[in-house]
Amino acid sequence: VTAAGTARTGPGRPRDPQLDALVLTATQELLVRDGYQATTIAAVARRAGVVTTSIYRRWPGKRALVEDAIFALDTENHPVPSGDLRTDLLAWTRLFLHAAAHPAARSAIPGLLSEYHDDRESYRRLLDGGERPTIQALRELLTVAAESGQAAGDCDVEAIFEFLRGATLMRALTHGTEDADHFSRRIADALYAVAQTPTSD
């Protein structure tokens, strides 16, 4: 889970944020109750009380809908920088862990990963739309931190992101939020060490 997705908009269709939210919530609830495979467009429409055509006008299919429902769990609420990099990295770690540990995310992510294995182009588009804004936010955080001597000026931002995402995702899928505070502090400490390491090293 990274940045929040938004409903895909068709040409000429006015946005209806309330309907979008209704459908995304229904999708999350079905993922928790029935699992990824059983969460179909028809089932979501029934639960949300809308017709399937309303969903297809916003999302091209189930996978796109589930992606947006999962990304909506963190709603792009990137932590507000505190001025202390270690504190900020801890906040980022907690955000990633709790979003990925949400029951809907734990239900959806294995199914999505299986589909991405067979469709690398869709996964690449997802990365561009979902992860790039988060990487940019991290880059801005680390740039400011470097100016105050808390990070290396040329630290590897994408490596930090991959470490953050991979560690929290695996932990969330296998342990949920068990011992979350201790885990988050250990990961934040490791991220802090990476941030202080120049790429040239």
Put a short name on every predicted segment:
Residues 41, 70-77:
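Short, basic, alpha-helical segments at the C-terminal edge of helix-turn-helix-like DNA-binding modules
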